[in-house]
Amino acid sequence: MDLKSGYPFWSIRNGLMRAYPRLEQDTVCEVAIVGGGVTAALIAHELLRHGHEVVVIEQRDIGWGSTSASTALLQYEIDTPMIELAKQHGMQAAALAYGACAQAILDLQGLCNTFGGTDFTRQDSLYYASRPRDIKDLRSELEARKAHKLPVEWIEREPLWHNYGVHSDGAILSRLAASVDPYRLCYRLFSECEQYGARIHDRTAIASIEPHEPHVDLRTEDGVGVRARHVILAAGYGNQRWLSQPVARNRSSYAFVTDPLHDSDMGALKHTMMWETARPYLYVRSTPDGRVVAGGEDDNIDIPARRDARVQSKLRTLLKKIGKTMPDMRLRPAFAWAGTFAETADGLPFFGPHAELGPRVSFAMAYGGNGITYSAIGAGLLRAQLESTPHPLSGLFGFSRLG
């Protein structure tokens, strides 16, 4: 299925950076990773660095699915606020999830610094109240984060307008966030993976998965066989095709990017990404070359033709919302696009085996607005499971939480 509409900026900016060979003959490996986006790349890189043998199989070109349509906001702030997550799983679990996401940003920073070329940029994150009635819960969210040592402060209405150009009654300012070019990150990771000995194949679709002991047999649509000791399904929202019941719902999100702006026009966006308490939320961030990326207006459409038809009307709505909240921001879109993604009921990901496919097949479902951050956590979690070592998030980020 086509995962995106319009012209995602990252694929236009970077082009097709590298073609990998199709898988054309039977192969045997320790770990087969199905998927070729940034989630698969982070997992492959983690496994290879720790001595595992990896084959990567992607049905499209590498990075050409949801990765190319991502706006790549790297936040510890989960789509579900900490106080709401605590109601579902308890405050200890909520704090564990938020803390792991905070550490993941630092881990991603270290990783990107080792090979460069990803446009990784540390930023602040401004989470502002969409309506006056949101202030009470936003204050409670601030106190919950402070209690667990997260770097946050409160911004009142006047300094919010004076320093950030945002009309709102209050906001949480977080000092730990970042942005990245997801497409470049994906390719840089896979380039590193090749140096560790990975075999990477694109334009190769998997038609069947047959778990056995002590291996798993995969078969491509062209009839080529792959026998692996372990399989990791990291194919984005398409992972759900392998389960009889969905564990997440598919949605579409809409975004645009401007031409480069002068520094004087960028204002606080140069160093601060901004998003709101409303759901679905509006978000705005900058790129290192002075562009503004904005998006939101999520809906339940995942039929490509219907999603395609909505891109321009969603663009107009996004511009109207930005104009209302940030009236000094004059934005002229250069490209607009939409992408299909999935989200879970509690905003948390799923990493690990599912009873339907047994212990040798693991899922990597980094769903929600924290996809790249979740993937960085999931890479370590899946390695721990592969090596039969405990991980503090195996339960919370596993299918067992579904009951």
Sequence positions of predicted segments:
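Glycine-rich FAD pyrophosphate-binding loop
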Residues: 49-69
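N-terminal Rossmann-like FAD-binding beta1-loop-alpha1 element of flavoenzymes
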Residues: 29-56
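Glycine-rich active-site loop/strand segments that organize a redox cofactor
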Residues: 69-100
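C-terminal catalytic lobe of FAD-dependent flavoproteins
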Residues: 308, 323-403
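Flavin (FAD/FMN) cofactor-binding and adjacent substrate-gating region
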Residues: 2-13, 80-85, 110-188
